[in-house]
Swiss-Prot record:
Residues noted as binding L-tyrosine in the record, renumbered to the chain: 35, 174, 178
The species this protein was found in: Acidothermus cellulolyticus (strain ATCC 43068 / DSM 8971 / 11B)
Domain of life the protein comes from: Bacteria
Keyword Ligase: yes
PROSITE patterns (UniProt xref): AA_TRNA_LIGASE_I, S4
UniProt keyword Transcription regulation, yes or no: no
Domain S4 RNA-binding: 358-418
Entry's Gene Ontology BP terms: tyrosyl-tRNA aminoacylation
Record protein name field: Tyrosine--tRNA ligase
Record text on subunit structure and interactions: Homodimer.
This protein's encoding gene: tyrS
Length: 426
């Protein structure tokens, strides 16, 4: 059986680490405890967090015990990592609410009951111990172990000091609070490994140094890479903003479409980062995808697996059916209103009056599927226009109000792949 560290290396998930052979030796003696922190700086986690979440899952599947730490305290402070400006401070009640939501979001990924895995995951909130510290205790018991020179040398801090913005004492202290988390988890659970993104490396090593000074033991850190895109744009962002795990912020349909639209050049890396399939399964999938690139087998596998993980198999089935139906490969009438609304919002939706009913020519122009009425007439004459998957052959045809989907929508399609929606006004 492949050792977990070898699997992580094959997947490209180890960007930097402390002594891997020492970590391997610790893992070989029995299950270890590993943690990752998630700060509630927004009402939801986003797909950028999936690398760390799924790395915790891989450790649990290999028999180790994961701790998911939600930063109810650190979320009040703000991590300067990866930022050129100071974070806005959120109200404590808001942060507490976000922390609860994030705890719930982690449940589909980690087994907190022990029913699936031998080592049940643990959920903690660092406000539990940090919130009880007085300023004097913080400075005497924790702060005295940190040397300002070393803190200033951390790349995150150094970069901010070089900038016009600078760094506040609040954010400068963040690495001390994160280090305290590692120390507290070592004391409570004998946690010996912290994982995080490569932009967190300075914070990870600060925790290692604190534990060595206070407890006299050596612990470990493992940093995952920052996910990039071949086209140079930021991973996890769309024209509409971040891709969230919360279905109220990013619909399951939009979530699915994000992965379906993955650039062919990114698919092999993303499958290794995000899929729970093993090496043999992924290599077989990559070969199949390479033989028929047009079928987008890699994108479909990625989209279906991750949508199922995040939103459940039932919801994934709905969005797969809706996606097929929108492009003429399924029955539109069977798509539920909520799923259809999300799909059309993602595709592009315009509202039009139906008194009198709009002409298909005008709908094609209004939705942006063609640039002009003359182009719309040409598309219809050439047999390339569809309303609710029915071909339109009459250039003067109107959209029949009696055939609107759920009494509200019409799906307008040009050719095989250009789709938009029309919603009845009022």
């Amino acid at each position: 059986m492949t050792h977990l560290l070898d699997d992580l290396a094959w997947r490209g998930l180890i960007a930097q680490s402390t002594d891997l052979e020492a970590l391997r030796a610790a893992m070989n003696t029995g299950p270890i405890t590993v943690y990752c922190g998630f700060d509630p700086t927004a009402p939801s986690l986003h797909i950028g967090h999936l690398v760390q979440i799924l790395t915790l899952r891989r450790f649990q599947d290999a028999g180790h015990r994961p701790i998911a730490l939600v930063g109810g305290a650190t979320g009040l402070i703000g991590d300067p990592s990866g930022r050129t400006t100071e974070r806005a401070l959120n109200d404590p009640d808001v942060v507490a609410g976000w922390a609860e939501r994030i705890h719930r979001q982690l449940a589909p990924f980690l087994d907190f009951t022990g029913e699936r895995a031998g080592q049940p995951a643990i959920a903690v909130n660092n406000l539990e111990w940090t919130g009880r510290l007085t300023a004097i205790e913080f400075l005497r018991d924790v702060g005295k172990h940190f040397r300002v020179g070393r803190m200033l040398a951390k790349e995150v801090v150094a970069a901010r000091l070089r900038s016009e913005q600078g760094i506040s004492y609040t954010e400068f202290s963040y690495q001390i609070l994160q280090s305290l988390d590692f120390l507290e988890l070592y004391r409570r659970y004998r946690c010996v490994l912290q994982i995080g993104g490569i932009d967190q490396w300075g914070n990870l090593t600060s925790g290692i140094e604190l534990i060595h000074k206070v407890e006299g033991v050596d612990v470990h850190a493992l940093a995952t890479p920052l996910v990039t895109k071949a086209d140079g744009t930021k991973f996890g962002k769309t024209a509409g903003g971040a891709v969230w795990l919360d279905p109220a912020l990013t619909s399951p349909y939009a979530f699915y479409q994000f992965w379906i639209n993955t650039d062919d050049r990114d698919v092999p890396a993303y499958l290794r980062y995000f899929s729970l399939k093993n090496k043999d399964e992924l290599e077989a999938l990559e070969k199949d995808a390479g033989r028929d690139p047009a079928a987008r087998l890699g994108q479909r596998a990625l989209a279906e697996e991750l949508t199922t993980l995040v939103h459940g198999a039932t919801e994934c089935g709905k969005v797969v059916a809706a996606s097929a139906a929108l492009f003429g490969r399924g029955e539109l009438a069977g798509v539920e209103p909520e799923t259809l609304a999300a799909a059309l919002a993602e595709a592009g939706l315009v509202t039009m009056p139906f008194d009198p009913p709009p002409r298909v020519v005008d709908a094609l122009v209004a939705t942006g599927l063609v640039e002009s009425r003359s182009a719309a007439r040409r598309v219809i004459s050439e047999g390339g226009a569809y309303v609710n998957n029915e071909k339109v052959t009459d250039v003067d045809a109107q959209i029949d109000p009696g055939r609107l989907l759920h009494g509200r929508w019409a799906v307008i399609r040009r050719g095989r792949r250009a789709v938009a929606g029309v919603e009845r006004a009022g």
